[in-house]
Each structure stands twice: as C-alpha cells, then as structure tokens.
C-alpha cells in the first residue's frame, strides 16, 4: 500500500538476454519447473497441455470431449494470444486447422477451459462513455501462463527468437496473465480497490 501512497519503490536490477526471456516465457511460472535443467523445465508446460487435452477437459464436468478438438482449440487460442477478436474469428481459425465446430459446441469447449482456469481473458476498459476515440470493447485473450501458449503451438525459445512478432504477443501475455494474476492484480485490488483491464484503440 505504501507504494500507492507515494512511498519509495524497491529497485531490482536484472540483465537477462533476449534468449533468457524467451526461455522464461516458454518455461512459465510452474513451481516444479523452477531450478530444473532447461529441457525438463520446458517439458512441464507440455505435460500440462497434454493433461488438459487428454483428460482434464472432460473430467472438469464429466462431459466427454474430443481431444483433437481440444488440441486445435488451444492451438488457435495460442495463435491469438494477447489479441482481441470475436469467437467467430477463432471458429474460422480452427476451421483452417482442419476441424469444424458448431457454435454451441465451441462455446462449451471454451467454457470448459475457463472452468479449468486454463484461460484468463482480460476484460476491456472503457474510460468514458462519451470518449472521442473508438475504444475496443472485446476482451483480450490470454492463457493463465504464457508457456501454455508456446506448448500448444509446439514452440520453444528458439522459435520465439525467430519470430519476434509472436514473441512480443506471448511476452505481453507473460506480463499480463502470469505475473499480474499473482502480483499486480492482487496488489492493485487490495491497495487501491481498483480493477485491472485492457485498453486498445480499434486502429491498433
């Protein structure tokens, strides 16, 4: 609370390379991954995604769901991480990946991922009902941990280094979904009784 009251901020110095950040983004914040050799650390997120696809998605409410559809849905979600759009956009993307969903079935799968706390979409922020700027009102799509996105895409640190656009989006998800869920959202909520939302103009 002292920080919000104007108190001094602690200074932490760190000099990670871009490669270090790529690794940490793909490793994620899984406690079991911390301190492990890199290969084992990266495997934690993949094991989690496999568990969601093969069993957890059906076990959450007792409804049997097709692992292939779950896999493609999570891959599409990963392709659109840190972006805004309609469910229709994601439905079209899933179709391009080789599967077709009915809208009702699709929404049930999305809801199951939310119940499992796999996804953590960030609500849109509208500063003023009469704002001159055309503010987007769609939520921003995120997984609860950015490593879920990279695992769903089958991407590793080297892949992110070779595609900085995707790296930037997943890094945004790291900042918003992973860190803020544990730290920023809680601090803001308790210290200033505020909410945590996203703001983006329709032009970009």
Segments and roles (model prediction):
Residues 1-2, 153:
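A generic structural signal for secondary-structure junctions
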Residues 3-51:
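Amphipathic alpha-helical "lid/sensor" segments that cap RecA-like P-loop NTPase cores
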Residues 34-201:
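Accessory nucleic acid-recognition modules appended to NTPase machines
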């Amino acid at each position: 609370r002292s920080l919000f009251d104007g108190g001094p901020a602690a200074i932490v110095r760190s000099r990670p390379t871009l490669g270090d950040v790529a690794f940490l983004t793909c490793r994620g914040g899984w406690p079991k991954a911390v301190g492990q050799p890199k290969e084992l650390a990266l495997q934690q997120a993949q094991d989690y995604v496999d568990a969601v696809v093969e069993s957890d998605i059906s076990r959450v409410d007792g409804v049997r769901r097709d692992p292939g559809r779950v896999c493609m849905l999570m891959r599409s979600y990963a392709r659109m991480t840190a972006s805004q759009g309609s469910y229709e956009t994601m439905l079209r993307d899933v179709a391009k990946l080789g599967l077709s969903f009915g809208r009702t079935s699709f929404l049930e799968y999305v809801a199951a991922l939310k119940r499992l706390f796999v996804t953590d979409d960030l609500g849109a922020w509208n500063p003023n009902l009469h704002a001159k700027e055309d503010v987007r009102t769609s939520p921003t799509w995120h997984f609860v941990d950015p490593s879920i996105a990279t695992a769903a895409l089958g991407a590793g640190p080297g892949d992110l280094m070779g595609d900085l656009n995707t790296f930037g989006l997943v890094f945004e998800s790291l900042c918003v979904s992973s860190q803020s869920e544990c730290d920023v959202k809680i601090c803001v909520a308790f210290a200033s009784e505020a909410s945590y939302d996203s703001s983006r103009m329709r032009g970009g």
